[in-house]
């Protein structure tokens, strides 16, 4: 879609003069109302990315297609999401590659699911388990909203991830966003191939201690835990300093590799 004009039915990020972002679905004849006035959708439809449009009060808005990070922060939620600052490091530390077979547990609202689907691409496969049907439907809707349709390589399953042990499937990567990942380690470890990577996402140190102990008992190697602290900077001609606010702790990321 990059390089093509905006069309009805797709999403646009509208960026105001103060850097505030608004995620809007474009409809012919529709209108976006906000504190800066009203913006007819028809002013955006047919225009290119990076175009500046003006509301009824003359306020300027820049038009861009949403990044995954924009979508994750604005999408529908059933459960708390993994934030963009953690999604990138998870994909890199778990070495999620195009064509990979990935097992996820704890779909939630689908933020990590979307990132995994885009990372593995059509040649890969993402199987995602969620025990709460209402969360799974939110994730399904978000996948359809972001990709235009639910990707053919995404398999959303209503149930306990331990059920995967009886399917005969094997995976190269396993990612667990569960409060007690150690409780499913035997089953997910059985379907993870030798050299495969297991990644957990947990909010507290107590949970991390128990998860790491279980991974070491199961003979996982290179077990490592880290967190990501994001600090943006204010850069001006006469001043360069950290911004007054930063995004600190959101969760601990633990990775380990399965041995033969």
Task: Please place each PLM-identified region on the residue numbering.
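N-terminal auxiliary segments of SAM/dcSAM-dependent transferases
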Residues: 1-65
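Conserved SAM-binding loop of SAM-dependent methyltransferases across substrates and taxa
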Residues: 109-122, 190
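Glycine-rich helix-loop-beta junction characteristic of Rossmann-like nucleotide cofactor-binding loops
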Residues: 92-97, 119, 147-148, 165, ...
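C-terminal substrate-binding/active-site "lid" region of AdoMet-derived donor-dependent transferases
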Residues: 185-252
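Short beta-strand element of Class I
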Residues: 123-127
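S-adenosyl-L-methionine
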Residues: 129-176, 181
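Conserved SAM-binding loop and adjacent beta-strand
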Residues: 3-4, 74-87
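Conserved class I S-adenosyl-L-methionine
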Residues: 97-108
């Amino acid at each position: 879609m990059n390089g093509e004009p905006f069309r009805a039915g797709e999403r646009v990020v509208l960026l105001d003069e103060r850097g505030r972002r608004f995620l809007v679905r474009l409809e012919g004849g529709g209108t976006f109302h906000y504190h800066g006035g009203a913006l007819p959708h028809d002013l955006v439809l047919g225009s290119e990315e990076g175009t500046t449009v003006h509301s009824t009060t003359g306020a300027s808005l820049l038009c861009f297609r949403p990044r995954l990070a924009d979508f994750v922060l604005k999408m529908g939620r059933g459960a708390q999401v993994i934030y963009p600052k953690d999604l990138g490091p998870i994909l890199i530390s778990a070495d999620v590659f195009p064509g990979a077979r990935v097992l996820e547990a704890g779909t939630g609202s689908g933020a990590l699911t979307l990132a995994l689907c885009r990372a593995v691409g059509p040649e890969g496969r993402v199987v995602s388990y969620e025990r709460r049907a209402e969360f799974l439907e939110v994730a399904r809707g978000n996948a359809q909203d972001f990709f235009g349709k639910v990707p053919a390589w995404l398999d959303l399953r209503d149930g306990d991830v331990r059920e995967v042990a009886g399917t005969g499937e094997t995976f190269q990567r396993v990612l667990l966003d569960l409060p007690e990942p150690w409780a499913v380690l035997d089953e997910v470890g059985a379907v993870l191939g030798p050299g495969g990577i297991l990644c957990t996402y947990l909010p507290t140190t107590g949970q991390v201690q128990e998860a790491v102990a279980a991974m070491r008992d199961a003979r996982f190697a290179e077990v490592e835990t880290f967190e990501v602290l994001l600090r943006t900077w204010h850069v001006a001609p006469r001043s360069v300093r950290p911004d007054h606010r930063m995004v600190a702790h959101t969760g601990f990321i633990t990775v380990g590799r399965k041995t033969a």
